[in-house]
Amino acid sequence: MKQKYWNINLEEMMEAGIHFGHQAAKWNPKMKPYIFTERRGIHILNVTKTARLLSEACDFVANAASKGKQFLIVGTKYQAADLVASAALKARCHYVNQKWLGGMLTNWSTIEKRLRKFEDLQTKKNMGALDELPKKEAANLERQLAQLQKYLGGIRYMTNLPDIVIIVDQQKELTAIRECINLNIPTICLVDTDCDPDLTDISIPANDDARASIRWVLDKLTSAIQEGRCNSTKI
């Protein structure tokens, strides 16, 4: 797929607060190439560089989507959880937005078993089978189902390991990143000024705390995924 313009507007980026980094004292020196200046003790990101890297990320996901690749979006911090879910549903991606369970990728066979249990319980509930059980037993199974829905609901239909993982907060999701590295799964990650860009395959320097910033970046990536799927070759 050719490189294209993804309607990445610098003024919109500034309005979303994408350029605001963390306190300068908390920075990671590896982020120096992406920092424009320091203002009142806060690092300011270079939005021109962010725009270029985001455009490259959009090209990458659009191309992957056109080939039928599957995506997982990860963001479990409270201000990102609902944004991750809505972005994933919009682009028909899998997602994790509550808690990353250790081994979710590296111990996939165990997760598959839990997903099968999830489906089994959901089917029984839908058929009314739980209503026929003693109240205590039914209540216990309802609690199990609620827990499975909370933590695995976003990957309920994920039948294999994802081809690409998009991560909202590197610091929060280090376990997920390490699992991707171990399995050679490409990652795209928002990296704030306290992050290590070397840990991810495609870094997008951006404010990873502000909801407006997270929403804006996810919107661009998921729009690119949608376009890639529309352009996929039908066999």
UniProtKB/Swiss-Prot annotation:
Q: Which GO terms describe its molecular function?
A: structural constituent of ribosome
Q: Name one GO cellular component term.
A: mitochondrial small ribosomal subunit
An example Pfam family from this entry, by short name, is Ribosomal_S2
Which family, according to the similarity comment? Belongs to the universal ribosomal protein uS2 family.
NCBIfam families, per the entry: rpsB_bact
Check the record and name the CDD domains matching this protein.
RPS2 (cd01425)
Cite the SUPFAM superfamilies for this sequence. Answer: Ribosomal protein S2 (SSF52313)
Q: Which InterPro entries match?
A: Ribosomal_uS2 (IPR001865), Ribosomal_uS2_bac/mit/plastid (IPR005706), Ribosomal_uS2_CS (IPR018130), Ribosomal_uS2_flav_dom_sf (IPR023591)
Localization (cell): Plastid, Chloroplast
Question: Which controlled-vocabulary keywords does the entry list?
Answer: Chloroplast, Plastid, Ribonucleoprotein, Ribosomal protein
| Name of the molecule in the record | Small ribosomal subunit protein uS2c
By its UniProt entry, which HAMAP family does this protein fall under? Answer: Ribosomal_uS2_B (MF_00291_B)
Transmembrane regions listed in the UniProt entry: none
Protein source organism: Anthoceros angustus (Hornwort)
**Which GO biological-process labels does this protein carry?**
translation
Q: Which domain of life is it from?
A: Eukaryota
